[in-house]
């Protein structure tokens, strides 16, 4: 036993987390590694930092490994964000930077600020490139901190001088524009760019590129060393990136300064339509170069109604956008940009209350000195519906189905938004189902986290719309692997009001009830049982809704559910709750709305096969009177249901049957049924009425 103990004592002690961190930094500082080795080291650093942060959340007294990360270490990681690094390395470095800034807190923010301003003060092209690249990468990670650096009073004014030097570096310009592009996410930064950089951006966009410049720009290795060359014209890539920034500034205009009495409507030097035209030309060319920026730019430009119309009126462009999306990598900027374009093309304006409409008119009047009069007519429902049809015809649905399988929650939200808009058109719903939209929506609803509540509600509502207009047997039948019961929970989830909404929108509730009614009409006990188990309380609540359409939809659903023993028991049991439910159903059978009366009558027609329900009707004041009232309704369908209920009452066996016949006769049942027979034209109604009369009269004799 002594030998193993001695051997174990010779094993070197495990390295501390601090030592592991320093070793990783030593490898990263040394350089000369293959890209995959660098990525592996960056991933190891990211894990160490994330583990450190989580451990300190549990134990605040624990020391952080960030204490061994000095300025040189931070410099090392941030330099891997340089645009001259391979894209895969930059991606892993972004994750490491994010993990460090989260773990290091205020100290990390100070080191980032020191790094940025030190590089800018040095003022070489290399330093500018790294500083701009770091700012562009950290804007999405720490937007407030990066905006603070960007808005430093000495920083932006210096860019104009830098960009107008006689000797220019395309990489400096590109890095600067990438930073400005990222900065547009912040409203104060947009205002600053408008103030200090707009003329330079216009200058870049307005230049007429020659074939020589285009050819030079197509060679990615021409300036791979990042040095300076004399350029008479900016590269095409830079021109399109500048156009993207202008599109963001035009799409989200800056707020007017206080006391500014100038007209709020001023023509831009380069209009959003001009920029859209530039992006369109690039997208239509069979070149990958510049397409990413053009897609991003068009995503912002397509917020404008005129641009939306120009896109859908160009079939070649629409097909190209669908093709670009189909070929784009999941979770890529191109995917997100293309999806954003289709969201903008298909998005309907929200339905407003009268009060909200008046408030919007007042705001429009105030913001445009009386020169704008409400929403653009190109955004009305008619124009949006036409755009949706054109987008659908371009073949977008199968592409969305493919992207939904590997998308992030953000991109999945965009996919759902597009399907949601397409589902407004009843004529498209069956085709959407055929092309896989139902499974897309079901999987999306189940896979999205609870934090994405808005997207989940849209998915459920789009699902409801499709299931209202299609035969569930065709959607879920055959050899399909998605069971019909899978649709129940998403639909039930939108019956209650949206807790995040300021005003109640009844449409989701109505559409969910209608779709569930369609599902409950199928010969599927498991589905009906699932609806009863998960939604009964909510259905009962909606039966009493003040909105007639919602109430009717809920009663129609109950009419289908009472074919199920579990639902029958809810009415037939001799309990106070069952009696209350029956009283509600009888009240609805006497409702002003014919559809509600018909649905309630249908439910009673099924339920009165059971003694407990018959006893409940005859024991309730006006219970039989309501049923007889249905027998003389102006609607043949309602008369049929009323007579069916009366027939069930008077033909019941035993004591309850005798009580029912006595009650019906006492309420003038013979006279009512006679009138019903005279009033009806349907053989089924007349025959059933005669049978009920014979039973009553036979009992009387």
Predicted regions, residues:
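Alpha-helical solenoid repeat architecture
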Residues: 2-9, 39-59, 79, 88-104, ...
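Acidic, Ser/Thr- and Gly/Pro-rich intrinsically disordered linkers and low-complexity segments
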Residues: 24, 28-29, 205-236, 325-334, ...
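Buried hydrophobic core positions in alpha-solenoid tandem helical repeats
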Residues: 24-28, 76-81, 112-120, 158-163, ...
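Extended amphipathic alpha-helical scaffolding regions
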Residues: 24-29, 61-65, 69-84, 93-101, ...
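Short inter-helical turns and helix N-cap capping residues of alpha-solenoid HEAT/ARM repeat scaffolds
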Residues: 34, 85-86, 123-124, 166-169, ...
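Short sequence/structural elements of tandem HEAT/ARM alpha-solenoid repeats
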Residues: 66-72, 106-115, 148-154, 191-199, ...
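Acidic, serine/threonine- and proline-enriched intrinsically disordered linkers and terminal tails
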Residues: 339-399
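C-terminal interaction modules of eukaryotic adaptor/scaffold proteins
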Residues: 526, 570, 615-616, 637-644, ...
């Amino acid at each position: 036993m002594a030998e193993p103990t001695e051997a174990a004592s010779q094993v070197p002690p495990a390295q501390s987390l601090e030592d592991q961190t320093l070793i990783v930094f030593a490898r990263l500082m040394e350089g000369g590694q293959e890209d995959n080795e660098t990525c592996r080291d960056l991933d190891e650093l990211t894990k160490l930092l994330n583990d450190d942060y989580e451990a300190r959340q549990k134990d605040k007294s624990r020391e952080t490994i960030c204490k061994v990360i000095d300025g040189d270490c931070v410099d090392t990681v941030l330099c891997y964000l340089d645009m001259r690094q391979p894209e895969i390395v930059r991606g892993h470095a972004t994750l490491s930077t994010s993990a460090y800034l989260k773990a290091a807190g205020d100290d990390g923010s100070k080191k980032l600020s020191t790094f940025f301003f030190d590089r800018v003060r040095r003022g070489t092209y290399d330093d500018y490139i790294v500083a701009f690249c770091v700012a562009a990468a950290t804007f999405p990670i720490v937007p407030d901190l990066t905006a603070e650096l960007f808005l430093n009073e000495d920083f932006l004014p210096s860019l104009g001088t830098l960009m107008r030097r006689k000797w220019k570096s395309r990489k400096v310009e590109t890095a600067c524009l990438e930073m400005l592009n990222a900065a547009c996410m912040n409203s104060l930064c947009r205002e600053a760019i408008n103030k200090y950089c707009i003329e330079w951006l216009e200058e870049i966009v307005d230049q007429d590129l020659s074939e020589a410049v285009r050819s030079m720009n197509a060679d990615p290795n021409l300036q791979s060393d990042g040095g300076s060359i004399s350029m008479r014209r900016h590269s095409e890539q830079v021109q399109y990136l500048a156009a993207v920034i202008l599109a963001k500034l035009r799409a989200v205009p800056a707020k007017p300064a206080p006391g500014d009495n100038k007209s709020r409507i001023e023509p831009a030097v380069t209009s959003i339509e001009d920029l859209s035209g530039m992006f369109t030309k690039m997208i239509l060319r069979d070149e990958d170069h510049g397409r990413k920026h053009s897609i991003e730019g068009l995503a912002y430009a397509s917020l404008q109604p005129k641009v939306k119309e120009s896109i859908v009126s160009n079939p070649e462009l629409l097909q190209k956008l669908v093709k670009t999306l189909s070929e784009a990598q999941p979770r890529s900027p191109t995917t997100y940009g293309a999806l954003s374009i289709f969201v903008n093309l298909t998005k309907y304006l929200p339905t407003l209350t009268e009060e909200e409409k008046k408030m919007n008119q007042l705001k429009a009047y105030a913001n445009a000195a009386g020169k704008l009069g409400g929403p653009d007519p190109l955004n009305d429902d008619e124009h949006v519906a036409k755009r949706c049809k054109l987008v659908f015809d371009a073949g977008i649905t199968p592409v969305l189905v493919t992207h939904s399988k590997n998308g992030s929650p953000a991109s999945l939200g965009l996919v759902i938004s597009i399907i949601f808009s397409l589902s407004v058109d009843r004529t498209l719903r069956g085709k959407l189902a055929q092309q896989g939209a139902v499974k897309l929506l079901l999987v999306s609803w189940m896979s999205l986290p609870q934090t994405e509540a808005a997207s989940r509600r849209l998915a459920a509502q789009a699902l409801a719309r499709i299931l209202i207009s299609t035969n569930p047997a065709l959607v879920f039948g055959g050899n399909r692997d998605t069971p019909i019961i899978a649709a129940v929970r998403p639909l039930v989830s939108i019956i209650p009001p949206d807790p995040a909404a300021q005003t109640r929108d009844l449409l989701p509730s109505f559409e969910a009830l209608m779709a569930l009614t369609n599902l409950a009409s199928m010969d599927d006990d498991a589905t009906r049982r699932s609806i009863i188990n998960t939604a009964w309380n909510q259905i009962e609540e909606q039966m009493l809704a003040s909105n007639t359409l919602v109430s009717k939809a809920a009663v129609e659903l109950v009419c289908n559910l009472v074919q199920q023993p579990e639902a029958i028991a809810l009415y037939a049991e001799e309990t106070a709750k069952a009696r209350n439910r029956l009283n509600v159903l009888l009240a609805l059978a006497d409702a002003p709305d014919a559809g509600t009366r018909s649905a309630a009558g249908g439910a009673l027609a099924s339920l009165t096969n059971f003694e407990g329900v018959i006893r409940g009707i005859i024991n309730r004041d006006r219970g039989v009177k309501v049923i007889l009232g249905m027998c003389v309704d102006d609607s043949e369908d309602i008369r049929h249901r009323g007579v069916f209920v009366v027939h069930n009452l008077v033909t019941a066996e035993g004591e309850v049957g005798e009580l029912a016949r006595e009650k019906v006769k006492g309420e003038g049942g013979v006279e009512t049924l006679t009138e019903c027979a005279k009033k009806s034209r349907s053989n089924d109604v007349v025959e059933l009425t005669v049978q009920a009369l014979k039973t009553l009269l036979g009992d009387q004799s």
